Amino acid sequence: MKKTLLQINVTANWGSTGKIAEQIGLCVMAHGWESYIAYGRMMNPSQSKLIKIGTQWDVYEHYVENLLLDNEGLASRKATKAFLRQIDKIQPDVVHLHNIHDHYLNYKLLFSYLAEKQIPVVWTQHDQWATTGHCHYNLCGCERWKTECHDCPLSKWYALDHSRRNHRLKQKLLAKLPSLTIVPVSDWLDNNISQSHLKERDIRVIHNGIDIHTFSPQPTNAFERYGIDKQKKIILGVAAVWDARKGLEDFYELAKRLPSDEFAIVIVGQLTEEAKIIDNG
């Protein structure tokens, strides 16, 4: 009898995490498994069997509830209950979580169900949301998540600050999962998770991979095309869209500190309208 993998992510074969889930699905199918991907928002056609969680109206309701009550991951009750009934039919051997935030899923209902059914869970950590009271990325240098979130510095984004409640609830629910493997995708995330409430769980770093047939050295005239001096040391940064979360401010600081006659800083990707252009030579 085939084993079954169920992955859960905000998107299916769309965006970075959606494409990662798609590749994992292809991999397990090549080894004889059946693959399902449950998603909440955008999708592209997939080789896995797709399950849509909720409707666009559920997303809107979840967004409003989060904005007013700081309830990210605690709305979408009806949509999540319907999804759990589908899991009952699938009976997966492993549930692999990716990004379960972003207004589409109730994690309290999901984790309670997974604990009751004792289904092994793998959770790939693409950001910091699992270890905080609501942030998916620490924008302000706050380290309360290491002990307990409270009085969130970003509470101005919400009508109410329930970061302490949210942080405690995540700890309580995750502690009940009998088989949980945490997979950070970078050493930086691993370092953060190892200082959080998840530090005692099974943590295994698996770095994001790339297609080496596409991303490999090729003969090119890029230096000439973009006016880059070959004699300089090149500092390269690559992101789909550049903003503070992707480390753009670090490149600004490097441009100020490094001598322009020795270094060239090259940024690949889309810049936001607010981004500054610094000519460091």
Where are these regions (language model features)?
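Nucleotide-sugar donor-binding and catalytic loop/hinge architecture
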Residues: 1-2, 219-234
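N-terminal subdomain of nucleotide-sugar transferases
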Residues: 1-50, 115-119, 253-259
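A conserved catalytic-core segment of Leloir-type glycosyltransferases
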Residues: 30-94
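Short N-terminal targeting/anchoring amphipathic segment
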Residues: 85-105, 118-126
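Membrane-proximal helix-turn-helix segments that form the acceptor-binding/catalytic region
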Residues: 116, 144-182, 195-197, 201-202
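Conserved donor-binding/catalytic core segment of Leloir-type glycosyltransferases
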Residues: 183, 228-246, 252-256
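Acidic anion/phosphate-binding donor-loop and adjacent secondary structure
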Residues: 191-194, 210-225, 275-277
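Nucleotide-activated donor-binding/catalytic signature segment of Leloir-type glycosyltransferases, i.e.
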Residues: 267-281
